[in-house]
Amino acid sequence: MSKLAIFVGKKSILRKIRAHKSIGKEEARAVSKIMKTGNLSAFYGTWGEGFYGRKYVKRFEKSCNKYFKVKYAIAVNSWTSGLICAVGALDINPGDEIILPTWTMSACATSILAWNAIPVFADVNYEDYNINPKDVEKKITKKTKAIMAVDIFGHSAPIKELKKIAKKY
């Protein structure tokens, strides 16, 4: 039996994963301005003024509406909350399946489980660790309702290929 690389076995990945800078000066200035107010949240556990966010949150949501050309945009407190909202917006029913990559955060599978749906894991590509469209297609069943595309290490998921698969089924 071979030994894991961590225990002096042979390394299987010999290259470094590329770093990706995703926060620019404009974003840093905006966050700094809010941080200096000393109040990051207006939510105190119950309904009240600011329950849905104050001026910066509302301004952000409106800018998202305009940028993405959508009627609604909802700011959430975390990536996990956003995923739970996104899965809920899909009209997923208990027992439905959503395909997602094996290399991702636990919040992806948790957001599926929050709606009593079933996470189905597809392999990832060696080159960029994103979901492998060929394996996605192998995992599709009559219960499959969605494919969760996850960007990894600043590399975009193969959206075009995943869209083709989704339209096919």
Report residues per predicted region:
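Conserved PLP-binding active-site segment in aminotransferase class I/II-type PLP enzymes
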Residues: M1-T80, I84-G88, A114, K167
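PLP-dependent aminotransferase-like
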Residues: G88-Y169
